[in-house]
Amino acid sequence: VPLSPVCGSDGVTYDSECALKLMRCMIQKDLHVVMLSPCKDASPSSVPELHCSRSVYGCCRDNVTAAQGVGLAGCPSTCECNRYGSYSKTCSPSSGQCSCKPGVGGLKCDRCEPGFWNFRGIVTDEKSGCTPCNCYPLGAVRDDCEQMSGLCSCKAGISGMKCNQCPNGSKLGPSGCDQDPSVSRTCSDLHCQYGATCVQSIGRAYCECPPSICPKNKQFKVCGSDGVTYANECQLKTIACRQGSVINILHQGPCQGTTPSTGNIQTTDLTPSPKEHTNLSKIVSLETIPILKAIFPVTDNTTGPQVHKMYTVTASPGVIGHPTAGWPPSSLTSSEPPDLSGSGDFSGDTDLEASGNLEGSGVEPMGFNESSTGPPTPVPNERSTCDNTEFGCCSDGKTPSVDGEGSNCPPTKLFQGVLIVEEVEGQELFYTPEMDDPKSELFGETARSIENALNELFGNSNVKKDFKSVRVHGLGPSDPVRIIVEVHFDPRTSYNSHDVQRALLQQVKQSRRKSIVVKKPEQDNVKIVDFDWAPLLFTTTSTTAARTTVPITTASALPVTRRPPPATTRWPKVLPHAKVPSTTTKPATTRRPPFSRKVEVRPATVKVHRPCDSQPCLHGGTCEDDGVSYTCSCPAGRGGAVCERTIVYFIPEFGGRSYLAFKTMKAYYTVRISMEFRASNLDGLPLVQWTEKGKGLHFYRPSEGYVELRFNHGVWDGVITSKTLIKPGNWHHVVGNRNRRSGMLSVDGEPHLIGESPPGTDGLNLDTDLFLGGTPEDEMTLVTERTTATKGLQGCIRLLDVNNLIYDLQERSNDVLYGSGVGECGNNPCSPNPCKNRGKCHMKEAEMFHCESVGEFSGPTCADKHNPCDPNPCHQSANCMVLPEGGSKCECPMGREGELCERVSEAEQDQGKAFIPEFNGLSYLEMNGIHTFVSDLLQKLSMEVIFLAKDPNGMIFYNGQKTDGRGDFVSLNLRDGYLEFKYDLGKGAAVLRSKAPIPLNVWNVVTVERNGRKGLMKINKDELVSGESPKSRKAPHTALNLKEAFYVGGAPDFNKFARAAGIISGFTGAIQKLSLKSIPLLKKENIRNAMEISNFRWHACTKTRNPCQNGGVCSPRLREYDCMCQRGFSGPQCEKALEEKSASGSESVAFNGRTFIEYHNTVTRSEKAVQVNYFEMSIKTEATKGLILWSGKIAEKSDYIALAVVDGFVQMTYDLGSKPVTLRSTIPVNTNQWVRIKANRIHGYGTLQVGNEAPVTGSSPFAATQLDTDGALWLGGIEKLAPGNRLPKAYSTGFIGCIKDVVIDRQELQLVEDALNNPTILHCPAKK
């Protein structure tokens, strides 16, 4: 097209004919070129228009339009141009061709041209023309597409709406799907647009649109720049991303403008809406955002003529799209006005008719034959043309409705059904309250998607010959969404509801293309019944009289009964005399024969969700299920409805199932016990007991108001009963002694009562914990067998004296190992009433209560009118937790953040950032057990942790042997600010406790070690704590046996931990380093599961801007950091570029195994006491051993640091006077290629990096931090090592190879000029 000015028929000069056509498209009016030059001064618009009677051919029948030829040629009555597909009512007088909108074809502009679709969008959405199919040529069979959805016909093995997707990340090429290494594997290779975020999964990276869920503070409607009202800001962003378009928020609240109904659109003046200028059909490439688009019409249930709106919905990336199944073709018996004929009618253009049939049907053209493996893919049948009409189809799927009431629709036989659906067209369904409104856009989108999927399944089932259509009647909350549908069949069909249900189930299970996913087991979640049995299943207000019905085409807002909570789900009853309101549908014109046989409707078997399934109890509380609700039994120090409150007690109170545990007491021959208690009732409850595997039981308990002392030496019990009656509510003092087989008991100073056990052994071995007030549930069985007592004390204990040692019973005591259900004596947790909304408070154990709801309120404290987690407001990968104070909290998996876990975390997006996990008290990391990382864990353990704590309580790590509260374990835990390192080897726990509280909000370095029974904990390199586990005379108990997972920062259920660990809360803070024998554990590839983990934002290495330049990797070092520079750069921030020097230059020195060069250990001077070392150098060698660098003293048992090649790998070894530390690289260097080495030491912490490998780290096990040297540094080797160093032979062998670009303490070392001795210095050859 020539780019010269032209004059338009509107009298305006345009820069070119293209500019004129663009304007014509935008204003949606007839505009053509009248002059191939600029318009003259007297524009055509200024000339008065002549009446048609004065034209050459006179007027048309409307007496307004001028005829274009003889015989009313070109007049609207003759042309019959479709008013939606054409620009005007007139046509060419010679050919009769109307002026069509873009993509519209046919003489009358009443159909989409080949390669275009969505004629209906011109009518309902005022689109500027038909939408291009954009079928991908390498994956599609044809260029045209299915007219209702835009779905292209794909070749075998290719999927996607536009046939542009291959499975498993393969690339679509001329020969089909081929594996392509260029497919994005990581997010660094992928650029996401339109608000999408990159997600890595199964070796692929893809773009994921944000969820449509919104926080409460954003739950208000907004008006988009496309003229559409959205439920909230989040829905707008989601739809914009799915459409691949930019939609901005114009203002809060609904859009003011309304879309005119079709009845009000004038042919002569069709005003474009803002939507006309927005390309809603934009296709984003697979490499950018692999999305799948499907079109779902929304029915606008308003008075007057019905308008169908089209909205674009995008499925999840990589989801296979499916064509919409139709029904057998048949001729229409009713005529239709030509302006509503849509794209399926005959247009008069015989050349385009065949193509139009194909584009409407999706059937492959004749002659096409492509071999494929696997079961045949269902091919959609021809769709009826009524889908493109103004009021859509009747329930028979063929007849076009002439009005919104469907007054002309033929009768159908109606079945109703309910399905519990999880996915539709690859999109996971989540219920939202907006789905209750049949007028909402969300209801329309979801319903249309479900109808398309079910139409496809029924259209390929064994009942398809009588099947007509499916209509969605209602959406309701379930697990996740309950769908109520109407299934329409031929009124003369012989199929019953069982046949229909069986056919649908068969398709759901066997269909290869999963257009709809029903919750498993499918047979329990699909139910079809006859229409007159529908109230039993749905309890809707549908009439039960009409068994054959004429459905209307508008959405019917039938109320749907919400299901009660899962624990109380019951099937609704039908009242025999209940009056059911009738619907607005017309009476049926035909009826089926009366229903003659009884149909038994059996409710589907639904998995019963127990109240404790969601693990509602916090901080290690035990959930107890009563079948309707739950209560939490809290550990000592916790209380509240779900153990959310911190309890501080001074005099412990026990509730019958409570207890406190202490260390095992020594009572082999003698023991003296004194205690003071107050009981609230007298039903034979134990006060204190301790056992040894069922033998030897010492036990106090009130029996009918009297205290008993029992002791057993292995055969029979010795029993002494007091004579003083115990009075409820009074304090009593009890003293008991045992000396071998003799015992004594006295209550409140009464005369001593003497007794003895039967003859046997005199000694009593006790090896379990001492329990006060009761026992753990699993220990109570043994107590019941020996004493008939079934519960613990209900009351208070203020004194316990064992062998003249008074135990501290307070909550923060060091004597208490662990406990459960203990509170302050005299406290009433129900005063004041913690239950909201008039809930009734029931006191349970001490400091614990249960709220009984009144009315419709629920939750731990009756704070919520509805379950805030049903439906789940969180992202699909997150867990929803009901809060005791009301509302909910989303527990995000690792990689997601935000109030609703709606965002991908920054650390997940930037894989180059350092990973410093931050914990919030409910977070945890789960890994494989530490026994899987090292082989010699049984006898020895060495771990280092660098952490920053924000709360004085919380678990740092735990690994155990069992999940029943017993067994071996190792743990590190903060308790009241003190750090506790515990391990149990089978005889009892060793407890190593810090001498002072750990400082908060600063980085702490802790090293824990175990060798046999002996343990050591070093804190911040200056505090040393030692201890050992209990010993046994029968077994050594020196091995640590671990079998379970390793948890960091917390766990999903603390009840599975060993009770002796005393862990009841998660860690709050950040963990910078966690290593096991220098093996770093905090790597993402080691993590099996994670919850509520985010990256610590307050360290330089995790901030948005990387402090290391030129691609350097930031390595955290407490508050500071080190930069691991890429090759060719050096400096603290890798800001210096190293010049590449010639290999024959003076700075590339060759070493022959006898060349030993001496330097100052800090380049310019000698330092005798060094806290920090930093080395960088490049080496080239073929040798498998040789000493590269040495700094230290040449004396026995002296400090040193060294670099050497050992077995072809670089090793860094240093000894600060306590124990040598060896770091070994994983990259071989004996390749005769230049390799860069970086090594540093900060106090006892060392790092080694060779090439681009991940740094290898380690630390000195004891408190030494200083390297004492003679001030010298040697390259290439040393004359003689001290005999006591016990280093490998490689350290006493000289280095053979080349060394260059040496950096010492971040200063360049001149290999020749800075040398202190004068050896023969050789140079490397010029050829590298």
Swiss-Prot record:
Disulfide bonds join C7-C39, C79-C91, C81-C98, C100-C109, C112-C130, C133-C145, C135-C152, C154-C163, C166-C177, C207-C241, C214-C234, C223-C255, C612-C623, C617-C632, C634-C643, C796-C825, C830-C841, C835-C851, C869-C880, C874-C890, C892-C901, C1101-C1114, C1108-C1123, C1125-C1134, C1298-C1324. Residues 649-825, 914-1096, 1146-1324 form the Laminin G-like domain. Residues 322-384 are annotated as: Disordered. GO terms for cellular component: basement membrane; extracellular region. SUPFAM superfamilies: Concanavalin A-like lectins/glucanases, EGF/Laminin, Kazal-type serine protease inhibitors, SEA domain. Glycans are attached at N63, N168, N279, N301, N369. Residues 411-533 form the SEA domain. One of its GO terms (molecular function) is calcium ion binding. Keywords: Developmental protein, Differentiation, Disulfide bond, EGF-like domain, Glycoprotein, Laminin EGF-like domain, Repeat. Residues 1-41, 201-257 form the Kazal-like domain. It comes from the Eukaryota. Residues 608-644, 865-902, 1097-1135 form the EGF-like domain. InterPro entries: ConA-like_dom_sf (IPR013320), EGF-like_Ca-bd_dom (IPR001881), EGF-like_dom (IPR000742), EGF-type_Asp/Asn_hydroxyl_site (IPR000152), FacI_MAC (IPR003884), Fol_N (IPR003645), Kazal_dom (IPR002350), Kazal_dom_sf (IPR036058). Gene3D superfamilies: 2.60.120.200, 3.30.60.30, Laminin (2.10.25.10), SEA domain (3.30.70.960). GO terms for biological process: cell differentiation. Residues 79-132, 133-179 form the Laminin EGF-like domain. PANTHER family: AGRIN (PTHR15036:SF83), PIKACHURIN-LIKE PROTEIN (PTHR15036). Plays a central role in the formation and the maintenance of the neuromuscular junction (NMJ), the synapse between motor neuron and skeletal muscle. Ligand of the MUSK signaling complex that induces the phosphorylation of MUSK, the kinase of the complex. The activation of MUSK in myotubes induces the formation of NMJ by regulating different processes including the transcription of specific genes and the clustering of AChR in the postsynaptic membrane. This is Agrin.
